[in-house]
């Protein structure tokens, strides 16, 4: 099983040219969770994408947007698991340019 830090690091690196199956496996998610929470599609649809080597860029803009929102929530969750609940203060500090 992957540790939270490894998953978090991978989640920050996800690009549109990554394969759907690779993303799911590297995020250590089940087909059910990834299909439902990541894209709001059935497992059958997810399996079709994976079996036909779909990349994130092959999906509709709406599907990619939903996935990006899911990924953002997932990274926040893992960040809090690793570094604690003061994530809002840290984000505020780094958001000022």
List each model region and its residues.
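Short, charged recognition helix plus adjacent turn
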Residues: 7-10, 76-97
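The DNA-recognition helices of helix-turn-helix-type DNA-binding domains
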Residues: 41-42, 52-54, 85
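DNA major-groove recognition helix of helix-turn-helix/homeodomain DNA-binding modules
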Residues: 1, 5, 33, 59-80
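A short, Lys/Arg-rich alpha-helix, primarily the initiator
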Residues: 2-27
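Short alpha-helical DNA-recognition segment
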Residues: 28-48
């Amino acid at each position: 099983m992957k540790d939270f830090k490894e998953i978090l690091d991978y989640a920050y690196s996800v690009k549109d040219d990554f394969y759907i199956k690779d993303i799911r496996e590297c995020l250590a998610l089940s087909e059910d969770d990834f299909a439902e929470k990541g894209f709001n599609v059935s497992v059958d649809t997810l399996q079709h994408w994976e079996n036909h080597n779909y990349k994130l860029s092959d999906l509709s803009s709406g599907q990619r947007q939903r996935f990006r929102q899911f990924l953002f929530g997932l990274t926040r969750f893992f960040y809090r698991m690793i570094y604690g609940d003061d994530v809002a203060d840290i984000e505020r500090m780094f958001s000022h340019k």
